[in-house]
């Protein structure tokens, strides 16, 4: 054995590893990154952005959306599929989904007769929340006070449904590309009698990290990202927006409170005001990236609720995920197919490159005229 305690082969391997590390550049060389929140890996292949695109191009959405359409079931005064007439609402409007995926009184399946064929009870409620009475606006085109009303409605419905159900999932699918069948600004709320798969993974990961390191995973992650800065998109007094180190979608972002907060209802008035403001800035940047109404799916994750709401959930940190599909332009999207479906997620653009592009974008919406832009910038 050598004096260093390693044989020549080990020294050669160590030397080769050092040489590889010295030449590695994340923006040029493929590598895999770990997602500690959801316990999975993503393949990053930034060099693929140099290839010419010959795949599918989505059609440009040039259709003008009317401000009010009496035939649109989400508009004030419209008749919905169940025959009910919407009120003449002027802010947010919450109602039961006419075609729910979960119902509160569904019968339970019987016991399984084989471990490979298991089924369990699934009960819950599904609601729809309209953000605004007008169909021709989206969140980035709404005022900060109007978005604040949405935040308050999110907190209220979480508290209401969370009194009975262990998981309340708020999510928004924006744009036809993400399967949204109605252009009216709205989201959905599904409350379930069970923890969905992703919630279970985040529960296990956050609990394990807190047990091992003594603090919440996402609190430490936020501190590290604030120090490193390269993936930050927006920061404010109470919130930060970043492209996660492990992002799978091209311009995916994570929205986090700076303070330790477990659920939406725990947000203070100041935090809610600030959340409305930073959401407007983020979504404006999204729209400005390709000068289009940027499609995405987003949703909130917080500590479980229901009968166990009073348990110790201090390992949880409230957060929102934004998953937009666009990659190269308003008409070229990322597809999660093939390798992603059969092996693991893969991305071309690095998270650092995505964050840099989003940071550089203006916080005034491209739809505004020059005079409006100057006024908004001064304000």
Curated annotation (Swiss-Prot):
Cofactor(s) it depends on: Zn(2+)
Protein residues bound to Zn(2+) 1: 75, 184
Outcome of substituting residue 34 to N: In GALAC1; affects protein stability
Catalytic activity, EC: 2.7.7.12
A GO term, aspect molecular function: zinc ion binding
Effect on the protein upon substituting residue 327 to P: In GALAC1; results in no detectable protein in the soluble fraction
Record annotation: effect of changing residue 259 to W: In GALAC1; mild
Compositional bias ranges of the Low complexity kind: 9-21
Catalytically driven reaction(s): alpha-D-galactose 1-phosphate + UDP-alpha-D-glucose = alpha-D-glucose 1-phosphate + UDP-alpha-D-galactose
Cited NCBIfam families: galT_1, PRK11720.1
Binding partners and assembly: Homodimer.
Name of this protein: Galactose-1-phosphate uridylyltransferase
The organism of origin for this protein: Homo sapiens
UniProt lineage: Eukaryota, Metazoa, Chordata, Craniata, Vertebrata
């Amino acid at each position: 054995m050598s004096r260093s305690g390693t044989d020549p082969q080990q020294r050669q391997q160590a030397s080769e590893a050092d040489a590889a590390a010295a030449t590695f550049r994340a923006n040029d060389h493929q590598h895999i990154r770990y997602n500690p929140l959801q316990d999975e890996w993503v393949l990053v292949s930034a060099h693929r952005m140099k290839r010419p695109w010959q795949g599918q191009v989505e059609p440009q959405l040039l259709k003008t959306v009317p401000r009010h359409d009496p035939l649109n079931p989400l508009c004030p005064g419209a008749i919905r599929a169940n025959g009910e007439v919407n009120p003449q609402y002027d802010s947010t409007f919450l109602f039961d989904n006419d075609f729910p995926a979960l119902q509160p009184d569904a019968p339970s399946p019987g016991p399984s007769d084989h471990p490979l064929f298991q089924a369990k009870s699934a009960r819950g409620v599904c609601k729809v929340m309209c953000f605004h009475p007008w169909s021709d606006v989206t969140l980035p085109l709404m005022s900060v006070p109007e978005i604040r009303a949405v935040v308050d409605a999110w907190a209220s419905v979480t508290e209401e449904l969370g009194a009975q159900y262990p998981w309340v999932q708020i999510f928004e699918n924006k744009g036809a590309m993400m399967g949204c069948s109605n252009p009216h600004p709205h989201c959905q709320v599904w409350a379930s009698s069970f923890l969905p798969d992703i919630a279970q993974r985040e529960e296990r990961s956050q609990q394990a990290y807190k047990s091992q390191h003594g603090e919440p995973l996402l609190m430490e992650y936020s501190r590290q990202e604030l120090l490193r800065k390269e993936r930050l998109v927006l920061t404010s007094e109470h919130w930060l927006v970043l492209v996660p180190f492990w992002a799978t979608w091209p311009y995916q972002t994570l929205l986090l409170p700076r303070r330790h907060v477990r659920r939406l209802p725990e947000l203070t008035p100041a935090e809610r005001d600030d959340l409305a403001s930073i959401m407007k800035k983020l979504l404006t940047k999204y729209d400005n990236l390709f000068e289009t109404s940027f499609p995405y799916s987003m949703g909130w994750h917080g500590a479980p609720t229901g009968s166990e709401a009073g348990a110790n959930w201090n390992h949880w940190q409230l957060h929102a995920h934004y998953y937009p599909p666009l990659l190269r332009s308003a008409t070229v999207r990322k597809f999660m197919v093939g390798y992603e479906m059969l092996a693991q997620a893969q991305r071309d653009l690095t998270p650092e490159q995505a964050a840099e592009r989003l940071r550089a974008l203006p916080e005034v919406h491209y739809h505004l005229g020059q005079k409006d832009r100057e006024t908004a910038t001064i304000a």
